[in-house]
Amino acid sequence: MRLVHLDLKGAPPKVCYLSEIFPLFRALGANGILIEYEDMFPYEGHLRLLRAKHAYSPSEIKEILHLATLNELEVIPLVQTFGHMEFVLKHEALAHLREVARFPNTLNPHKEESLALVTAMIDQVMELHPGARWFHVGCDEVYYLGEGETSRQWLQQEPNSKAKLCLSHMEAVASHMRARYPTTTPLMWDDMLRDIPEDQLSGSRVPQLVEPVLWDYGADLDLHGKALLVEKYRKSGFSWLWAASAFKGATGVNQSLTPIEHHLRNHLQWLQVAGSVPADTLRGIILTGWQRYDHFSVLCELLPVGIPSLAVCLQALLHGDFAENVKARVENFLGISSLEEMSFRR
């Protein structure tokens, strides 16, 4: 699968714009979209405070899903449930659920109310995505894990560790998903799992509950290291893995023009990784397109600016390289005479 990531935490597109670019996504080779709603989802009830003033309405969400279906794009929703909780924990009414009082990034995994909060968010999103085969629960960059006072005390007890604390919250979230929605598989960013020893991973239930997404947005991947990481995850019990590249939003917090060459190299490197691991290992790749590095950050490249890069990257994945004939196809798709004119450098 080839999924385009829609990051809605900055300059979210209008539905009419999505109706124009979804056919392009499909024509370029995408067959799915990962929608990171953040505060653009129309949360209701006690979660209403999470929604932005310009959040999509339920009818607009349904229209987006309809447009995706028309263009044969499978939709995977994404809701952060551990790190990058700024849009939730910035609110005074929920600030007591922070791991560290000063920082709204990380959820306190010790409080029952924390799990109740994120499962309620999941449930509301799933209500509008009843047929979702996968659901992304985030869990990346949990920066302040273990630094709260409750965590410090807990970590002083043997055999507790940050890895155990991390895995226990992941397991709780994923267990809710599996129990409540048995036909939906949770996805999870892999960075918090990378340094956890294989025996600790296999000793938890996480490998039976989720499919990790290995992300790396660099132009020069450690190919051998990636192969070793894949092997470690497989030995730990994960049945399927995903990859995540970037077509924009990964080369600078205030980047305004997309360096296409960087992102093309990133995808060509991921093709090498895919070719070096067993065929039944990677289920698909998510082409991320970040709008902001976090909820409080400035905007990086906007989605329309990143479309040429997305076209290059999708076509490279589809054809397995970026030869002259593939380049010509992209130029034809975009209606431009030369891609070189669009290879901006900051």
From Swiss-Prot:
Inhibited by O-(2-acetamido-2-deoxy-D-glucopyranosylidene)amino N-phenylcarbamate (PUGNAc). Inhibited by galacto-NAG-thiazoline. It holds the Pfam family Glyco_hydro_20. Its EC number is 3.2.1.52. Signal peptide: none annotated. One of its GO terms (biological process) is carbohydrate metabolic process. GO terms for cellular component: cytoplasm; extracellular vesicle; nucleus. InterPro entries: Glyco_hydro_20_cat (IPR015883), Glycoside_hydrolase_SF (IPR017853), HEXDC-like (IPR038901). GO terms for molecular function: beta-N-acetylhexosaminidase activity; hexosaminidase activity. It is found in: Cytoplasm; Nucleus; Extracellular vesicle. It is an enzyme of class 3 (hydrolase). Keywords: Cytoplasm, Disulfide bond, Glycosidase, Hydrolase, Nucleus. The active site is at 141 (proton donor). It catalyses: Hydrolysis of terminal non-reducing N-acetyl-D-hexosamine residues in N-acetyl-beta-D-hexosaminides. It comes from the Eukaryota. Homodimer; disulfide-linked. Belongs to the glycosyl hydrolase 20 family. Has hexosaminidase activity. Responsible for the cleavage of the monosaccharides N-acetylglucosamine (GlcNAc) and N-acetylgalactosamine (GalNAc) from cellular substrates. Has a preference for galactosaminide over glucosaminide substrates. This is Hexosaminidase D. The lineage of its organism: Eukaryota, Metazoa, Chordata, Craniata, Vertebrata. The gene is HEXD.
